[in-house]
Structure formats: C-alpha cells, structure tokens
C-alpha cells in the first residue's frame, strides 16, 4: 500500500491527514491508474484509521468543480478523488467546505 499510517498508535491523539488528494494520488499511481483498486485500498486504510480512538482531521481538495479534462488519466483521478471525498464525508461527524477562507458547514 502507498501508506501505513494506520499502523501507528494514534489513540488519544489529534491526527491531521493533509492532504487526502496527495494520499489518493499515491494509491492511484501505485495501482497504475486503476481507480477501482485504488478506491478499495484507500477505503480499507481509512477504515483502519477510524478504528482507532483518535480525533481525525482530513484536509482534501474539491477538484471536480472545474471543467472536464480531455486527458483520460486526469478524468479517472478526478473521479477517484470525488468518490474518496464522498466516502470520507459520509463517515465524518462534521464536514466543512472552505471557500476563499470562509468555512461553510456541510454536515
């Protein structure tokens, strides 16, 4: 896997994962652009992280709001990032979307 942060003892700690986009990029390229395999592995690692009794903060990028790239690899990665963001947000207690430094509470 592209990361093994979940193997660390995180109980009782505040942990910032910055940045989810780079984290996803590592899995995407380790898996040679296979979005399905990358997403499965990212979800597995996320689930292992959230099993610990830690306060987790995930910082990510919303890269799907712009135009659609003509490049197939970029489109696949944009999809992967969107699916990963949705997965994390669905399991988060709180989601804040930052726009120009202004927090907008989503959840």
For the regions a protein language model found, what residue spans apply to each?
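Short, small-residue-biased leader/transition segments that mark boundaries at the very start
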Residues: 1-6
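A basic- and aromatic-enriched beta-loop-alpha substructure that forms the phosphate/nucleotide-
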Residues: 7-28
């Amino acid at each position: 896997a592209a990361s093994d942060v979940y193997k660390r003892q995180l109980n009782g700690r505040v942990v910032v994962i910055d940045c989810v986009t780079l984290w996803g990029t590592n899995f995407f390229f380790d898996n040679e652009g296979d979005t399905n395999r990358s997403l499965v592995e990212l979800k597995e690692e996320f689930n292992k992280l959230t099993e610990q009794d830690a306060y987790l903060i995930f910082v990510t990028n919303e890269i799907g709001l712009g135009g659609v790239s003509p490049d197939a690899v970029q489109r696949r990665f944009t999809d992967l990032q969107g699916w990963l963001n949705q997965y994390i947000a669905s399991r988060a207690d709180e989601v804040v979307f930052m726009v120009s430094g202004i927090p907008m509470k989503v959840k």
